[in-house]
Amino acid sequence: MTNKAIYPGTFDPLTNGHLDLVTRAAKMFDVVVLAIAASPSKRPLFDLNERVALATQVTAHLPNVKVTGFSDLMADFARQQQANILIRGVRAMTDVDYEMPLAKMNRHLMPALETVFMLPAEAWSYISSTLVKEVALHGGDVDHFLPAPIAKEVRARLHP
């Protein structure tokens, strides 16, 4: 049986913390689908196609990672992808508190889908896309927190 994992998120923008998790997941699972949620209610900085293109660019070195956009219910998307693992990154207990009901609902909707919580590397344990965007918006240097091509696009978008 192939262990196919889905790592879903808005990834607006995809940070070095996200890249660390997907890189580590690629070593653990046969296939990892980096599933980028449309999330229009979050009013993303980059549209879905832009986020998919940027994520594809920075994960090109990972042959078993496939990047795709989605707007479905997670359990339905996992079924379509024939995935049996759902990866969720957790930085703190507040993330666990948020993720537990989602994991339980996904288990109810698709019992074969197992949720795996992964901790970020220490260097990335405090960053989030929202925090990085806020720093960038105010002219702060975000190069340390984002893959280079994404940092360049964030700067161009926020400070044309």
UniProtKB/Swiss-Prot annotation:
Enzyme nomenclature, EC number: 2.7.7.3
Residues reported in the UniProt entry to bind substrate: T10, K42, M74, R88
Compartments in which it is found: Cytoplasm
Pfam families associated with the record: CTP_transf_like
Gene Ontology MF terms: ATP binding; pantetheine-phosphate adenylyltransferase activity
Residues reported in the UniProt entry to bind ATP: T10, F11, H18, G89, V90, R91, E99, W124, S125, Y126, I127, S128, S129, T130
Catalytic activity: (R)-4'-phosphopantetheine + ATP + H(+) = 3'-dephospho-CoA + diphosphate
GO cellular component: cytoplasm
InterPro entries in the cross-refs: Cyt_trans-like, PPAT, Rossmann-like_a/b/a_fold
Cofactor needs: Mg(2+)
UniProt keyword list: ATP-binding, Coenzyme A biosynthesis, Cytoplasm, Magnesium, Nucleotide-binding, Nucleotidyltransferase, Transferase
GO annotation, biological process: coenzyme A biosynthetic process
Major enzyme class: transferase
Site (Transition state stabilizer): H18
Domain of life from the UniProt record: Bacteria
Function: Reversibly transfers an adenylyl group from ATP to 4'-phosphopantetheine, yielding dephospho-CoA (dPCoA) and pyrophosphate.
Descriptive protein name: Phosphopantetheine adenylyltransferase
